[in-house]
Amino acid sequence: MVLLLCLQIIVLFYYGSRKAGFHEDELYSYYSSNKTAGLFVNDREWTTGESFRNELVVLPGEQFRYGVVKQMQSWDVHPPLYYYLLHTVCSLTPGIFSKWQGISVNLAGFVISFILLAYAAYLTAVYPISMQPEPSDSQKQAYRKRGYALAGTVCAMWGFGAAVISGVMFIRMYQWLTVFVLLCLCLHLRALVRKRENWKFYLLLAVTVFLGFLTQYYYIIFHFFLGAGFCLYLLKEKKWKSLVAYVGTCAAALGAALVYYPSALSHIFKGYRGTEAVGEFANASNTLERIQFFTGLFDKYMMGGFLAIWLLLICLIAVTNRFLQKRAKRSGREQKRERILTPPVGLLLFTAAGYFFTVAKTALLLGETSNRYELPIYGVLVLLLVYSLYMVQKEMEQGNAQAAERIALMASPNLPKEEIRKQNAPGKKQKITGKAAVLVVVLMAALNLTGNKVFFLYPEEAGVQEFVHRNETTPVIVLYNEASETHIWWLLDELSEYENIYLASISGEGEILTSENFLNGNAAESQKYIIYMADCENQGEELQRLLGTEFPDGSDASGEISYEEVARKNMWTIYEICSVK
């Protein structure tokens, strides 16, 4: 497992080195974690790239200002815990803005998630032994081996998933939401296996609910279904005191989180995302479309496009096995078989289905980037698929071994029964199954890591970044749209590299190059400018109007004007203009 984790970390560092740009939400993560003076648009005025950069980094003397971070999030629609973590890392590296600060936070979350998912898989596999009053040492050892095998297979498929790698590359809170989802799941599975809930369980539960809620509000959706399933289990077992203690602990932890962060109520019930989510959930007409959309994402970015084959294979083996069981029952040779749908599996299935459906109904539809909303349960879904396939295949092997034993007894009645059982034991088949599992994991990893399925890397930004670094001293004119002036902040990582920047609204009157404010700037006499222009109708005509210059394609006959489109990105077009005076 350690070797597997190290290999996956190496893969993550490889993709981290390829990350060349940022999603606008990632830039907001840095800004809302490290704000200094705030971002303001002063129309038709010069500013410096340093003033933008100061909003992305922690300046010396401004480290560990968690109160500012909390206040910034209260003005947005998210809880603050993830931003505390990012601010901490940036505080330890003051004055630096780097993708590795955010990736390192997510990488730590990935490692913790890996360990928790492995533990969840192990607990799911060994649960049946807890149902036996006095299991033998050999039985315990067999179930432990099963647990290790299941944990290794699940973590390998999960950690090499394109969606999971993308989640680490995306500098937002979803990887840490996965941490608390899996931590909460492990607490409940452990309680099922041990069949008791002590004070340590309730203490860890309270901490998990508190921190999970302060990481992302989707945590409540997960815990609602997990808690409902666990309460049904407590009711079935008639553990009345445990039920009261469980509900009380969850309510107290949630109440403490709301007392600490009261803005959460307005975010959920009055914020634009909360009201949008409620509206989408109430709209029954889009249910099938949304479920198909998110199922397709899981299939493509986690299962390599083979989800249908997995499900078909599980169903075929299960149906065949059921047929053989019925035939054995009619002939009086039915053998006792291990249950597949154990309480842990039922809890996993109920929770994953509830979360998947609710999030599919309420989350934003943003193409492949919408994977982040279902990311916290991708490990659970992989666990359910691998466990189901393993168990139905194991039942088939068990049935075949028993049938072979009966045939051997009839053919060789003089042979000792133990010798016949040893000859027909499924040991070799288990080795074949293990090799097949390794082959499947390698195939799934290859399918996930090829075809440019890992996103949030923005490799096309590499050329733009080179252009920016070559022109750091060139004055920049940002022509923004007043209706969407916040789109300026989508360019923060680039604008922070330039020395002088002039902001001007596209709808403004008068030529920019001859305006008093422009001429008073230190860069007014430059013979070259970089133009960032927001997308708009008649963009070329608007550009000429604002600069008071007609630009022919390429250069004019006298060579006095050079006009070139450098790149298009995020609703912006970058131009390079030389000798415009």
Task: Give short role names for the model-derived ranges.
Residues 101-141, 183:
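Transmembrane-helix motifs of polytopic, lipid-linked glycan transferases
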